[in-house]
Swiss-Prot record:
'Misato' means 'beautiful dawn' in Japanese. One of its GO terms (biological process) is positive regulation of mitochondrial fusion. Keywords: Mitochondrion. It is found in: Mitochondrion. Disruption phenotype: Irregular chromosome segregation during mitosis leading to death before the third instar larval stage. Larvae show abnormalities such as absence of imaginal disk tissue, and reduction in brain size. The keyword Protease does not apply. The gene is mst. This is Protein misato. Belongs to the misato family. It comes from Drosophila melanogaster. InterPro entries: DML1/Misato (IPR049942), DML1/Misato_tubulin (IPR029209), Misato_II_tubulin-like (IPR019605), Tubulin/FtsZ_GTPase_sf (IPR036525). Its main location: mitochondrion. GO terms for cellular component: cytoplasm; cytosol; mitochondrion.
């Protein structure tokens, strides 16, 4: 029987919602409407029904919204109604109608309510709310007047993920934690234990679990869950308990992505030293829960390391420049990885599934994996893939997005996905091939086949599953296109040495490569987490003392983290 194998996505925390916003914006950018013609064949596009659901709003209009549950603090939604903008009995006010009075402006609102079908004038009760701040991009979006060439300066002005959100959500998607207001200077939900306590509160738990159930009951063949969450604060505890609930109730595959902020995390009433200790405890408890509850998890950060990194040393990607601690820009990179890495089991014509994808890169119980990214991919204009890979030699194609982690080039198990490389860029026709004919890779007949051969030759004793689609990463608004260097062409290829894009032109799309990797060397990442725990004096952490975390509970988590690390010993390989 042919049916959709759906995935339900979760986003816990502010940074997770930054990443998720870019991810959903990318999905919308790939939608096709009407007679739009693209170079990408239908079967090479994502099957949007895996992540989206069709419904009808109060006006009996068809909606198509992400199958998503998002959790964040009060104060992050700004102008965005908690019910979203496609449902509900509210009317979005025009800028010129603010503030609302009892005169002509009110009559205009009544007329608009009647025309939109929300209710009749007799049924209309007007309750005016104070004006919420709204970004220039969102204001233009509401008026359907976004100018793609306009510089909205989102990197400098975005104060929340809603400022650059293009996708529209279902009423059950947004969940705001009561009594916790976002503070840019400190984490309001500070500790892992605070997150677990929040999950156990009846006011939150019952409604949230009901929303999960409603989503699941709509599915024909639910295959699993994507879980993005901030691991440095209490949202890790919330996500951990949610994973436990999902396993108990639904027994489906779960791919978790713990996200580290690209800046030094602060907590209420804690100096730098105490803040570091709180973050260590949060990570220890979070990793322990992930090792038990997730089928696979991949820590993500644009920082080289998250421990004792006071200078915020960031990873670097050739052809890109970004502000190290900018949430809007860094989250776009993590979202690009997430979107590309998961394409292999989201394409319309693919035998892959989330379960098989996870199992292929987690041998011997090694649930933790690493993330590799190449954005843009690095091909020069007019260059074929066979030449690019031949000239790369031992030079790594990928930059790591898992902090403090280098999987190496031996005994690696990995899933690699390439996007945006057209089939005609694979190699030259035989009559024009020249030296390419002497290369073993010339026998390859697809992008994925050639990548598989490349890693077979350059990664000793490794296993690679490669997939490819000609669909590039779309980098128009609201993606932070300003990150691309001048030496990158509009379609994301490297220009000749010294050449630059036309002044005022922007990169519209880019080829890229993403990989989920596993090897014995990932044990070093777990060693780093455990090493930091020696500096922690749990009794001095008032935030944890108040939450009731027992020393025995913490020691048990540490011991089991060491047992999990033992799975990455050489003797456990395959």
């Amino acid at each position: 029987m042919d049916y959709t194998r759906e995935i339900l996505t979760f986003q816990f925390g502010t940074y997770a919602n930054y990443v998720g916003t870019h991810f959903w914006n990318q999905q919308e950018a790939n939608f096709r409407y009407g007679d739009e013609s693209e170079q990408v064949a239908e079967e090479q596009l994502p099957n949007n029904d895996i992540l989206y659901r069709e419904g009808r709003n109060d006006l009996n209009r068809t909606t198509y919204t992400p199958r998503l549950l998002s959790v964040d603090l009060s104060g992050t939604l700004g102008h965005l109604p908690v019910t979203g903008e496609l449902y509900g009995n509210f009317v979005q006010r025009d800028e010129e109608l603010l503030p609302l009075s009892t005169g002509e402006e009110l009559e205009q609102v009544r007329k608009r309510a009647e025309e939109s079908g929300v209710c009749s004038p007799e049924q209309l009760e007007v309750q005016e709310q104070s004006k919420a701040s709204i970004s220039e991009y969102q204001r233009d979006l509401l008026k359907n007047a976004v100018v793609p060439e306009k510089n909205y300066q989102l990197a400098a002005t975005a104060n929340s993920w809603v400022d650059f959100l293009y996708a529209r959500y279902h009423p059950r998607t947004l969940n705001v934690l009561p009594g916790l207001i976002r503070d840019p200077t400190a984490q309001a939900l500070g500790t892992y234990s605070a997150g677990t306590e929040m999950w156990q509160e009846v006011s939150f738990n019952e409604e949230f679990c009901d929303r999960i159930r409603l989503y699941v009951e709509e599915c024909d063949g639910l295959q699993g869950f994507h879980v993005l969450f901030d691991i440095d604060d209490g949202f890790g505890g919330l996500a951990g308990k949610c994973l436990e609930h999902l396993n108990d109730e639904y027994s489906r595959a779960s791919f978790a992505l713990p996200l580290h902020y690209p800046r030094i995390t602060s907590y209420p009433q804690a100096d730098t030293r105490l803040s570091h200790s709180i973050r260590v405890v949060n990570n220890v408890l979070g990793y322990h829960q992930l090792s038990e509850q997730a089928l696979m998890f991949t820590p993500l950060s644009t920082l080289e390391t998250i421990w004792r990194n006071n200078n915020l040393k960031s990873r670097s990607l050739p052809g890109l420049q970004w502000e190290t601690d900018n949430l809007y820009q860094t989250s776009a990179l993590l979202a690009a990885f997430f979107d590309t890495a998961t394409l292999s089991y989201r394409l319309r014509q693919t035998p892959e599934s989330l379960l098989r994808f996870c199992e292929c890169v987690t041998p011997a119980g090694r649930k933790m994996t690493a993330a590799g990214l190449a954005l843009p991919f690095g091909l020069r204009e007019g260059q074929d893939l066979i030449e690019f890979l031949d000239q790369s030699g031992d030079h790594a194609l990928l930059t790591q997005l898992t902090p403090g982690c280098e999987p190496g080039t031996s005994y690696v198990v990995q899933s690699v996905t390439a996007r945006g490389i057209p089939a005609e860029r694979l190699k030259r026709p035989r009559e024009l091939a020249g030296d390419q004919l002497r290369m073993a890779a010339y026998s390859c007949d697809s992008i994925s086949h050639m990548l598989q051969l490349y890693y077979q030759c350059t990664y000793h004793g490794s296993v690679t599953n490669a997939a490819a689609t000609p669909l590039p990463l779309k980098t128009q608004l609201p993606f932070p296109y300003e990150m691309f260097a001048a030496g990158i062409s509009r379609d994301g290829y490297r220009l000749p040495e010294g050449a630059e894009r036309e002044t005022g032109s922007r990169v519209d799309s880019a080829p890229m490569l993403a990989a989920v990797q596993n090897s014995t060397k990932l044990g070093e990442h777990l060693d780093n987490v455990h090493a930091q725990s020696h500096r922690v004096q749990l009794a001095k952490l008032q935030a944890y003392s108040n939450s009731g975390l027992e020393r025995d509970e913490y020691d048990t988590a540490l011991d089991q983290l060491l047992e999990f690390r033992d799975l990455y010993a050489d003797s456990q390989y395959l």
